[in-house]
């Protein structure tokens, strides 16, 4: 998601820190979207659906009970969702229950800022091997924000010098939450890749 966007940005500026990239449904969209004057769907962060998420709960169990049967959480691995509830909230400063560790307004502002972060000038020069895991893409004609669909441009992998495209239509944008072992396997495989040696000894 945004993590994939961030590590791609960092790798594009300094590859010394990377041996292999595993981009899990990264928020790197169709390049045309970054050029569109209407790319900002919401005028203010407060209008973004993420900013309107419920953020206050009596405790982690209350959060679990509220969302366990709802989409997209019902699709997640149960242990992952339990961890999300147990570790994704922190005590409120006023002592009245718990709140999301990442305030919804902050999360929304990060996603809105992404529309001003075009990485396509950096991507073609990245030599680091890349794997792009992506789910079923979003409908470009839809005006509804579907958080389960992939924001990743389907042609993204082809823009890197050395990349593998892994299409996972049976999964949603929440790939690590649904199949953590699959993601772990790709990370383990990437970690075993030997660094490219430049020059001669």
What are these regions (language model features)?
Residues 158-201:
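Catalytic active-site module of serine/aspartate enzymes centered on a nucleophile-bearing elbow/loop
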Residues 1-36:
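Conserved hydrolase catalytic core segment
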Residues 78-121, 137:
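Hydrophobic, aromatic-rich cap/lid helix
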């Amino acid at each position: 998601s945004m993590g994939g966007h961030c590590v791609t940005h960092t790798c594009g500026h300094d590859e010394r820190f990377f041996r292999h990239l595993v981009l899990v449904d990264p928020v790197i969209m169709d390049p045309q979207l970054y050029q569109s004057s209407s790319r900002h769907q919401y005028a203010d962060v407060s209008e973004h659906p993420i900013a309107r998420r419920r953020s206050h709960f009596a405790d982690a169990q209350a959060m679990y009970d509220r969302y366990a049967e709802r989409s997209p959480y019902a699709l997640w691995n149960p242990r992952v969702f339990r961890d999300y509830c147990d570790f994704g909230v922190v005590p409120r400063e006023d002592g009245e229950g718990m709140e999301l560790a990442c305030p919804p307004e902050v999360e929304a502002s990060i996603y809105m800022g992404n529309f001003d972060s075009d990485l396509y000038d950096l991507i073609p020069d990245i030599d680091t091997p890349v794997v792009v895991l992506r789910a079923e893409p979003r409908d470009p004609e839809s005006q509804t924000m579907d958080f389960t669909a992939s924001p990743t441009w389907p042609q993204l992998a082809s823009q890197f010098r050395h990349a593998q495209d892994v299409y996972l239509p049976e999964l949603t944008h929440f790939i690590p939450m649904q199949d953590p072992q699959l993601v772990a396997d790709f990370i383990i495989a990437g970690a075993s890749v030997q660094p490219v040696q430049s020059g001669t000894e």
